Structures are given as C-alpha cells and as structure tokens.
Amino acid sequence: MSIITKEFKIKAKGLKFPEGPICMNDGSIILVEIARGTLSKINTLGETEVIADLGGGPNGAAIGPDGYCYVCNNGGFEWEVAQNDKFMRPILESKSYSGGKIQKVNIVTGEFSTLYDNCNNTPLNGPNDIVFDKSGNFWFTDLGKVRKRNMDRGAIYWAKADGSMIKEVIQPFMTPNGIGLSPDERSLYVAETEGGKLY
C-alpha cells in the first residue's frame, strides 16, 4: 500500500474560525470568519482584508450569478477558547443573538443587505451553508441554535435570489450543515453534524 503525500501551503494565518471558502478567478479566496463576524478576502500575497463587517455569525457563503456574495448568517455563538488562544470552538447561542438571516454582499463596495430573516413568519434560526442551482436561485441549511438546556431542530430551504420567495423544503432535520447539488441537480446532498452522516 502506498501513501500519497502532497505539500500544503499556508495561505493565511490569524483567521477567526474561517469557513465557506470561495476561490475567485483572480487567485484570491473569499471566506467568512464566524468569530470575527466578517466576510473576508485573502489576496494572492496571503494578506487578509475585510470585505464587510456583517456582525452575528457569518457561516456559509456562495457567489451568485449576479456577482454578489450570499452569506448564511447564524446570528453568532459564544466561544470556548483553549490552548493559549490557539483553538476556539462554538458552544452556545450568542448572548447578543437576534436571529439568523441570509445576507447579500457587494464584494467590491462591502455594502450588504438582509435578503431573508424568516420563512412565512417562522424565523431563520441558524443558517449554515448555501448552494446555487442553475436557475440562479439557492438552497440552504438552517442548523438552528444550541442553548444550555435545549437545541433547535433544523431545516432545509429553497429561495429565490431576488428576495421574492422562500420555501421550507425539509423540517425537522437535526443539525443540517453542508449542502451541495449533483451536476444534473437531481440530487441534493446534506451533511448532518450530530449524526456524522451524509444524505
């Protein structure tokens, strides 16, 4: 049995719980920093700059067909920090939590708006990850929030990118996290955090 090894290169350091990386055509990487509350960009020199200070807990991100970045904002966490500030993990809903939302960000100017914060008057609790379909609309997971003695049951949504329609497609779903579409878009894939499963 042979072991394949590849060299890895560190592109940036000091990021505050990065997720949702997007490789851009110019070689830069756009990602969210959940603990920092930002949508950030790492240029080809490895320098990090803030595109937008979104607040809460920006989680997953995807570039839409209009060139805007669509961000799942989970509303924020309380954090446990260990190993001399070298390791941090989310543990509970933030004390300043005011709800989850889908945000639309102009990656050139940093201007942003809230596209959705509810579905038929049911609040979004903790939007987590997002994927666009060929029609230019998107699917996203809502993992929910964890509190000291209870946690939400999550859901999967489909929404129009122009802000005109959102549908709850599957609920309940325990801790839906990553989401993706097959190339022919006949299959939707969802990762479940708590159970360690892929559906």
For each feature predicted by the language model, list its residue ranges.
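Sequence-structural signature of mature extracellular/luminal beta-sheet repeat domains
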Residues: M1-Y199
